[in-house]
């Protein structure tokens, strides 16, 4: 299989004051390196950057890349403020600090078909018999995300919930949000139980542990959830999505200042390009991503 030239993969995470979050990013990137080796990319240079609370920053990491471009992969599950504003601003700052910087920018990790497989992996880890069709048919799921002030991001979560229920035959899958939108996870659990659901479980749609993950778990268990899954973390499916995003972006890497059909409108003059639809998404029949 032909792969694009091996430019560095710079994975940019939100960052947190909770040390568990940075440790989880480290574990995920170790999984990415291992999966890359299995896919014929044994020398892949993988680096971590953070938008807030942790070091190094994205401009710092990009400034340390020598001899060529880098592919920036947001470790974010939805396209919202961080991907639409924070990352472009930091890319612009990096370009100003490093003349001639070449950057290929990938899309966010979600939506992607493999992420529902990762969610089911974590539910399985929590004791839910996700491989039993009879259990799925009698189990209602709360898909608990961080939540956003961007309605489009929350709509993405709602669409994921509907698609997951349809494709896998859960009794119901409903979205819930730990902040900025409703219903909250505890409210969603109570609503399902009041509606006759005999068994309600909560699937935590977060990459790393921290304040939101703890909040979701406490509220869900307090409302009577039978199980609450852990964060996605270094699940193999997540590592594969990171690689999919990287390969799509790296294959479209360009020289700074050049034009390209998929250059992001936020900063085409910087040579910042968005990764296109991946081979995995085409194979799974996923709808095209909107930039």
Question: How does the language model describe each region?
Answer:
Residues 1-291:
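Active-site-proximal alpha-helix that buttresses catalytic centers in soluble enzyme cores
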């Amino acid at each position: 299989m032909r792969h694009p030239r091996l430019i560095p993969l710079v994975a940019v995470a939100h960052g947190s004051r909770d040390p568990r979050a940075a440790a989880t990013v480290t574990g995920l990137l170790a999984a990415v390196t291992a999966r890359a080796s299995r896919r014929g990319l044994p020398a892949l240079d993988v680096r971590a950057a953070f938008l807030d609370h942790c070091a190094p920053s994205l401009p710092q990491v990009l400034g340390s890349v020598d001899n060529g471009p880098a592919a920036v992969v947001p470790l974010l599950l939805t396209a919202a403020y961080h991907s639409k504003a924070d990352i472009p601003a930091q890319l612009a700052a990096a370009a100003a600090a490093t003349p001639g910087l070449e950057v290929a920018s990938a899309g966010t990790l979600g939506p992607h078909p493999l992420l529902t497989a990762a969610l089911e992996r974590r539910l399985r880890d929590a004791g839910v018999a996700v491989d039993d069709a009879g259990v799925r048919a009698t189990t209602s799921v709360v898909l608990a995300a961080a939540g956003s002030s961007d309605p489009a991001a929350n709509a993405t979560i709602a669409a994921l919930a509907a698609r997951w229920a349809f494709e896998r035959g859960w009794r119901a899958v409903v979205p819930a949000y730990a902040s900025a939108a409703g219903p909250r996870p505890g409210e969603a659990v109570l609503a399902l139980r009041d509606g006759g659901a005999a068994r309600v479980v909560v699937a935590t749609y977060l990459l790393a542990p921290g304040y939101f993950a703890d909040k979701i778990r406490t509220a869900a268990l307090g409302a009577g959830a039978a199980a609450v899954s852990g964060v996605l973390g270094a699940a193999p499916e997540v590592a594969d999505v990171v690689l999919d995003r990287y390969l799509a972006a790296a294959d479209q890497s360009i020289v700074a200042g050049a034009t390209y059909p998929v250059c992001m409108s936020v900063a085409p003059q910087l040579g910042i390009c968005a990764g296109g639809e991946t081979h995995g998404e085409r194979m799974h029949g996923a709808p095209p991503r909107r930039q």
